[in-house]
């Protein structure tokens, strides 16, 4: 009897978490569909803001959302080592939350640890392939590493999901750098 009650409780909890995540995914799918079709930058930025809001909110655990906010504040104030520990802890708690990986990738970028940042970006993109922020960060690292063709590919991937993405404006500049390198 105790085992079956325990099993039912576990089943209920897991269905709740699954439902919250699928609900969040449905909203994201809708926003990304709108983002592909929008034809003015003001509307695009509003949709982008909504997407970021969802990415920054854990689907089932408000404490993780609060920790992500705290880590982000630490990062903004330049306390990269402490922010890194906060994001590490979040990732251990929920390794499937793409935004925790993205924040850690950002900290590594700010610390000029580009290989670590790229590894974290790869994880972000495995969890959320449409993450235009991670793709933009990846492009910026490739620019710093003078891997210009890879930078363009990263931006082009982001533009598939977000055609009016500001990072698209980097492509002509990157192409100029490629020409300069070939001289």
Language-model region placement:
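Register position in tetratricopeptide repeats
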Residues: 57, 76, 110, 144-145, ...
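Terminal, low-structured helical/coil segments at or just beyond the last alpha-helical repeat
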Residues: 57, 152-183
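Alpha-helical adaptor scaffolds
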Residues: 60-127
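Canonical tetratricopeptide repeat
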Residues: 103, 137, 170-171
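TPR-adjacent "capping" and linker segments in tetratricopeptide-repeat scaffold/adaptor proteins
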Residues: 21-23, 52-66
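TPR alpha-solenoid repeat register
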Residues: 100, 134, 167-168
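TPR/TPR-like (Sel1-like) alpha-helical repeat modules
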Residues: 33-39, 143-166
